[in-house]
Amino acid sequence: MKLKTFFVLLLALIAIQRVNAQAKSYILHTVAFYNFENLFDTINDSNIDEEWLPDGAQNWTSKKYNQKLENLARVLSEIGTGSIQDKKNPNSPTLIGGAEIENRGVLEDLVKQPKLASSDYGIVHFDSPDKRGIDVALLYQKKHFKVTSAINIPLIIYKKQMDASAKKKNEADDASDDKSEVELNSERVYTRDQLLVTGFLDGEEINVIVNHWPSRSGGEKKSSPFREAAGALNRKIIDSLVKINPNAKVITMGDLNDGSYNRSVKVALGAKLKKTELKESGDIYNPFEQMAKDGNASLFYRDAGDIFDQIMISQQFTLPDYNSFRYWKAGIYNMPYMIQTVGQYKGYPLRHSINEVGFSDHFPVYIYLIKQIN
């Protein structure tokens, strides 16, 4: 009889523990990155925008511009959920990194779109010296994220870096050397700055770096030193943040114009495939490396799918407890309406053409951050 009573009590205790486990609640925030692909207005200004004017090569009219804004807003509004338990209540991302942005004005037009207006986004944007006249930026929901500092950090690179790389193309690749030849008196290549924003996400300090690394113009191998320099600058920024605060939480995201396997990411930045490889606070985990290995793609480069758009996180986001914001999972947002369905580019992102205003030649990427609240 006593034994029977013991088993009844044991089963009751197990049931209570299960109920408590099921009752756990979490705060969830989505962090996204989207290359908007040529988000230009129709106003002729001092920037390099002649192609994107009503009488330009793209015949970029106000009607097309407004349709582009509507398309982007639709995508952004659908990424993310209000909570893990309530996936039927979508909420646009708390933080959005963006690239290929002409100026602050186009961002102001974007966040005013009906599908985004209720999220009340703030904007962090600086003009960069990029030769195409495009910048990076961060959009943030004001009710959740409070900016404390923002700075644009220039990437100083020179044409001689590319030339030196071409001369060495037949030499053995030394993975321990992530430096390129630089001649300071050679011609500077003007590209996008790296944007560093620090703020409090629901009271918890995080640092966000938004990137758009140099393109593969001139060839992947020949231009690689430029992106390796971008990766090294990213590494320097992260190291400086961790030096100030050993427990710093860092998110670095952007269109890197390289895959997770390239030297710029693996060597210069030092991103890791597995969370178990993270040994120090400044070590970086790249969840998109495994996704690429699994055959996923955020774009197609020379007819091959790849993930150039990546969001990476520092070790502090990967700790096993959920008493503060931790990384949960990552994804690529590629709904059917965003995909080309016919023709030579079937399966590719549905981008802009002369006859159709699409979305972008990239799919947006995102991660979820979660924190236990009971």
Where would I find each of the regions flagged by the language model?
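Structured beta-strand-rich core segments of catalytic domains in phosphoester-bond hydrolases
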Residues: I101-E205, W213
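Active-site metal-binding loops of divalent metal-dependent hydrolases
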Residues: F36, I101, W213, D255-L256
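Active-site His/acidic residue clusters
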Residues: N47-E50, A57, E204-F226
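Active-site environment of divalent metal-dependent phosphoester hydrolases
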Residues: N103-G105, K131, R216-G218, N257-R263, ...
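Active-site-proximal beta-strand elements of phosphoester/diester hydrolases
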Residues: T30-N38, S149-A150, E205-S215
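N-terminal, active-site-proximal structural segment of metallo-dependent hydrolase catalytic domains
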Residues: A21-Q113, D120, V124-L138, D173-A175, ...
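Metal-dependent phosphoester-hydrolase catalytic domains
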Residues: A21-Q22, E228, S240-V250, D258-N374
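Bacterial Sec-dependent N-terminal signal peptides
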Residues: M1-Y26
